[in-house]
């Protein structure tokens, strides 16, 4: 379980032994106006549910990536063709090279990576101690 500074709560789970999963790195945001779902196994899609839909016509809709989204058009000129894992690696490499040459900022930077590591350590310690643990408590630990 997680609790954010703004009061939002959530849950995180991880498993390397979940049967039937290949690369189910995913997140789901459930909010007052709807739900948004991303799954790495289908990374060219977002699933969106909007709470204000008419009864009987409600349900998730699938938003597909296309040329209007980021670097997609550099690989595919039209929607529906989808980019793959290798294209993502090319995009990541280009962004890294641009950062090395000072054309863009690198993300995450070392400070952000440190903050992410504190969150992971807080989660590990919280699980080990069966208590709430804040990333702020992980300073210099």
Which sequence ranges carry the predicted segments?
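C-terminal glycine/acidic-rich active-site capping loop/insertion
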Residues: 3-6, 33-107, 139-141
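Rossmann-like dinucleotide-binding domain that binds NAD(P)(H)
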Residues: 1-24, 111
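Stable alpha-helical structural segments in soluble proteins, enriched in small hydrophobic residues
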Residues: 84, 88-92, 120-130
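Conserved loop-to-helix N-cap of the C-terminal "lid" that shapes the substrate pocket in Rossmann-like
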Residues: 107-113
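C-terminal capping/lid region of NAD(P)-dependent oxidoreductase domains
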Residues: 125-141
């Amino acid at each position: 379980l997680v609790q954010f500074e703004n009061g939002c709560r959530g849950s995180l789970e991880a498993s390397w032994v979940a049967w039937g999963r290949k690369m189910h790195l995913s997140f789901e945001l459930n909010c007052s106006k709807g739900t948004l779902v991303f799954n790495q196994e289908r990374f060219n899609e977002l699933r969106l549910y909007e709470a204000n839909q008419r009864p009987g016509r409600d349900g998730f809709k699938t938003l597909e990536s296309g040329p209007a989204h980021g670097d997609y058009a550099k690989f595919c000129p039209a929607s529906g063709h989808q980019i793959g894992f290798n294209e993502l690696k090319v995009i990541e490499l280009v962004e890294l090279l641009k950062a090395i040459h000072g054309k863009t900022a690198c993300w995450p930077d070392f400070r952000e990576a440190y903050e992410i590591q504190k969150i992971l350590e807080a989660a590990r310690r919280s699980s080990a101690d069966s208590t709430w643990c804040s990333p702020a408590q992980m300073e210099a630990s």
